């Protein structure tokens, strides 16, 4: 369950940032998780509850934003959002594309007091 490792590191980063600001409490964390990152949002929330105890984030609210998959078609020179996991360009049917978004695992923001 790599969500525990991800959240352990995220809480450590959040705590260090809060301490640098002389904060006494982390009120909220917002994370961006890509749809094809391999991270399960529900498991990440569960991991947060497990690892935040005893830290400045103990009572914080975790908000998870899902980032959809966006591709760029090298043939059409256009971005597109694939309707499923078969990343065929809807305009030209090309399979020559690059993934622009959807793999993110990021701590977007931190709210402290």
Curated annotation (Swiss-Prot):
Pfam families (alphabetical): HypA
UniProt superkingdom: Bacteria
One example GO MF annotation: nickel cation binding
Coiled-coil residue windows: none
Name recorded for this polypeptide: Hydrogenase maturation factor HypA
Organism: Picosynechococcus sp. (strain ATCC 27264 / PCC 7002 / PR-6)
GO biological process: protein maturation; protein modification process
Residues that bind Zn(2+): 73, 76, 89, 92
Keywords attached to this entry: Metal-binding, Nickel, Zinc
Its job: Involved in the maturation of [NiFe] hydrogenases. Required for nickel insertion into the metal center of the hydrogenase.
Protein residues bound to Ni(2+): 2
Family indicated by similarity: Belongs to the HypA/HybF family.
């Amino acid at each position: 369950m790599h969500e525990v490792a991800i959240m352990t590191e995220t809480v450590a980063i959040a705590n260090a940032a809060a301490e640098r600001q002389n904060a006494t409490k982390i009120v909220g964390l917002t994370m961006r998780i890509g749809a094809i990152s391999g991270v399960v949002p529900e498991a990440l929330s569960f991991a947060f509850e497990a690892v935040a105890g005893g830290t400045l984030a103990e009572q914080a609210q975790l908000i998870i934003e899902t980032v959809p998959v966006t591709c760029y078609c090298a043939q059409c020179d256009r971005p597109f959002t694939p309707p499923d996991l078969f990343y065929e360009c809807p305009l030209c049917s090309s399979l020559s594309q690059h993934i622009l978004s959807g793999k993110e695992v990021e701590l977007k923001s931190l709210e402290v007091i």
